[in-house]
Amino acid sequence: MAISIKTPEDIEKMRVAGRLAAEVLEMIEPYVKPGVSTGELDRICNDYIVNEQHAVSACLGYHGYPKSVCISINEVVCHGIPDDAKLLKDGDIVNIDVTVIKDGFHGDTSKMFIVGKPTIMGERLCRITQESLYLALRMVKPGINLREIGAAIQKFVEAEGFSVVREYCGHGIGRGFHEEPQVLHYDSRETNVVLKPGMTFTIEPMVNAGKKEIRTMKDGWTVKTKDRSLSAQYEHTIVVTDNGCEILTLRKDDTIPAIISHDE
């Protein structure tokens, strides 16, 4: 399937969907504290998406996924299923991954929350993971190959003593939740996509404190690090512009501009 180039009208709708997804993460922040269940956080997010934003969660029912957001704690790499029995505790690192649909278009984003008092490793892993995403975002412009971006993420992460998960990647996005291209966060000879203005996709590195290997739990969704080391992830949805990119899911706590341009 070809990579779709979005029209200005499409991009405007994606700005709206992206802003809504970012707002869910901004809204949930004060609720992420020791003693709260991931099931409760999911309900708060779902109520906000449905009743305040008048939007739809793309995750709910996607391939049978039972909840509205993914909440992944500590050694859980991704796709953690919210559960009333799963309570957050001091020092946990928690990824909340939100995808909303508004007016037919998707906005997909995730960030790490540190519960209560951070551990040194947890804080460092989260910081390096976010820095790897920012490094990638600053590289995006027409004419660059996605392979260069994946290689740069891998080099940066491994220089810090961490590893990049291979099995999951960023993806094209728009009317579809997962479109072409695949956006790998490591160097691969199979990647050969030259960026053009109007392409929309996510960059979402998953970084493990230990080794890169993962395993999927019996529920068929929850993915953990094989060595039980901590794992972190940050994700933004972006559009390639004529001279860089625009981040469609920027939050108030982000420390990178929404529009990155490479004009001389």
Swiss-Prot record:
A divalent metal cation 1 binds at D97, D108, E235. PROSITE patterns: MAP_1. Keywords: Aminopeptidase, Hydrolase, Metal-binding, Protease. Its EC number is 3.4.11.18. Its cofactor is Co(2+); Zn(2+); Mn(2+); Fe(2+). A divalent metal cation 2 binds at D108, H171, E204, E235. Monomer. This is Methionine aminopeptidase.
